[in-house]
Amino acid sequence: MTKSPVEPDEAGENSNAQVIDENLSAEVFDLLWGHDRNAIPTVVDYAYEQIWKQLVFSNEQKEQRLSDVALAEKLGVSRTPARQALERLVQDGLVRSDPRRGFWVRMFTAQDIHEIYDLRGALEVLALRLAAPQLDPADLRSQLDLLYKVREQLDQRPFSLFLQCDFRLHTLLIRASGNGLLIQYLSRLRSQFSMFQVKDTSYPKRMEAALDDHEQILLALLGGNIDKAAELLAAHIAHAKANVLADIFGEKGTASFEKP
């Protein structure tokens, strides 16, 4: 009998896993990693993308084993590229490897979330400050136009368009920093916090609040007020951290990033 690529832990069955919207998951992956893709993707690249989408778009929050044999069979590849893809995901922080028990979906602790988002906040604020003098006002206005388009459609819950708007602003600021090492570190962090960004689309009020934050950041940058933009970005990321902690751990003292 063939094993499931994601095996249930001893506590129960994998019965609540979300069915992946292939179009949306492909768009999200392309938005995040399209600029880093090889011109001709390898078999490992393909396996990595498919497993990444499975992890990011799953609602399951239990520790589960990832079978390289079953994944290889499901994806139509040999075991070696499936294993190499899992090893890459270990480096990205989405999977953990146990020498005796194989590969497992990483379960984030509250301390992990604090560390990820605190580091993200510090690095993205630095990226904004480095990027600000180089930013083209036309790019900022284009981002505002996209934001207003998303806002007009909020009642329709435009998941894809919202994520596009969200990822594009952060990517614009990070890449415009011109600091290769900073971009590299944030790319690795993004592998970890992107799954929480995707899950935020389940909360329309959070999407609305995030758009409000983005608008204020963009207007501050267009007005040449870099200090204000940096302060707003830091608060935006702190709110995102509070939401993740409240969602996963019900941590008290974390204000919800939702409007009443």
Sequence positions of predicted segments:
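Mobile beta-alpha loop/short-helix "lid" or hinge segments that flank ligand
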Residues: Q91-R96, L189-S191, R206-E208
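Short, flexible turn/loop "capping" segments at secondary-structure junctions
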Residues: Q64, S97, D166, A209-L211
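Short helix-capping/hinge motifs at transmembrane helix termini and TM-loop junctions
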Residues: A132-P133, G178, S202-Y203
